[in-house]
């Protein structure tokens, strides 16, 4: 079996719509017949995990045959959020290894903000999907933009982190290895 495609929905800004977009991508892939594994790294909110748990409960209660993703168990999110980075990475790596064996696509939903788990996930991505809204607050995610001329003055911290993930991929897997970055 070929390695699964890894999609990371990422953006350091909270409230940009990452979890909502992740849910729609997963649902579309499931209805296209793909085996999808999800990993929700927003350890405190777990919006994507909760959505699919509620969907499964509703489907079972109503006898509806809805396709569902698999989700490796990372334990209680709030407890894991308080654990040290080494423990968080151990749990994530175990979940990722399990997902690799069970899916055509692994979709990872990341939290707003810079975390060790988010950086690690970005480095594993084949595709990074970044939702943003039409505002200067969101445009600053991509880079500092002159509000009058709309010229890009410098890349943002998040753009630099995506660049670092791409650079790491090229160094570790060869110059033709790439990470696609899709901004929606």
What kind of feature is each model-predicted range?
Residues 1-4:
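Phosphate-binding P-loop
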Residues 24, 28, 120:
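Active-site signature of alpha/beta-hydrolase-fold catalytic machinery across serine-
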Residues 32, 108-184:
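Conserved catalytic-core segment of NTP-binding enzymes
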């Amino acid at each position: 079996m070929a390695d699964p495609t890894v999609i990371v929905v990422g953006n350091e800004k909270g409230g940009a719509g990452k979890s909502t977009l992740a849910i729609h991508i997963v649902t579309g892939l499931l209805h296209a017949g793909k085996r999808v594994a999800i990993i929700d790294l927003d350890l405190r909110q777990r919006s994507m995990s909760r959505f699919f748990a509620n969907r499964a409960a509703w489907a079972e209660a109503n006898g509806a045959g809805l396709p569902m993703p698999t989700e490796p168990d990372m334990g209680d999110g709030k407890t894991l959020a308080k654990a040290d980075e080494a423990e968080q990475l151990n749990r994530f790596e175990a979940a990722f290894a399990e997902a690799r064996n069970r899916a055509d696509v692994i979709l990872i939903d990341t939290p707003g903000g810079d975390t060790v788990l988010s950086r690690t996930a970005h480095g594993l991505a084949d595709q990074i999907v970044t939702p943003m809204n039409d505002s200067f607050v969101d445009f600053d995610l991509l880079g500092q933009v002159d509000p009058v001329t709309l010229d890009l003055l410098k890349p943002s911290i998040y753009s630099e982190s995506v660049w670092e993930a791409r650079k790491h991929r090229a160094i570790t897997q060869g110059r033709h290895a790439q990470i696609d970055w899709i901004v929606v």
